[in-house]
């Protein structure tokens, strides 16, 4: 499959899974990074993606079990407190998130 076709398929899978008109490329960027490096703490994610902490937090909440404000919860990630440093959160994929990762990137994607 050509790279552009692969990317189109990944975007379609992602936007279908979120079923939300509020989906942005930033949501997919954050989700993709979590897929590559999970579990990851929120501070490391902020550094790796070179995004503001507030932006990362907003995106994480919309990808999580809870959602926030008008954004429907996607239930793709789980956010837990980092017991080593309570200022940070540990992010990992839920079962639904792992299923989407497999659809987007294939079964052999690193977990």
List where the protein language model places each region:
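C-terminal flanking helix
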Residues: 64-71
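Alpha-helical linker/hinge and terminal dimerization helices associated
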Residues: 100, 104-111
């Amino acid at each position: 499959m050509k790279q552009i076709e692969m990317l189109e398929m990944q975007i379609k899978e992602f936007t279908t899974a979120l079923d939300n008109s509020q989906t942005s490329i930033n949501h997919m960027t954050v989700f993709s990074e979590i897929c590559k490096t999970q579990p990851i703490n929120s501070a490391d994610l902020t550094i790796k993606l070179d995004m503001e902490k507030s932006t990362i937090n907003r995106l994480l909440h919309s990808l999580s079990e809870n959602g926030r404000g008008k954004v429907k919860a996607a239930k793709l990630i789980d956010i837990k407190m980092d017991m080593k440093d309570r200022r940070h959160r540990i992010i990992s994929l839920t079962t639904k998130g792992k299923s989407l990762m497999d659809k987007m990137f294939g079964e052999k994607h690193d977990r």
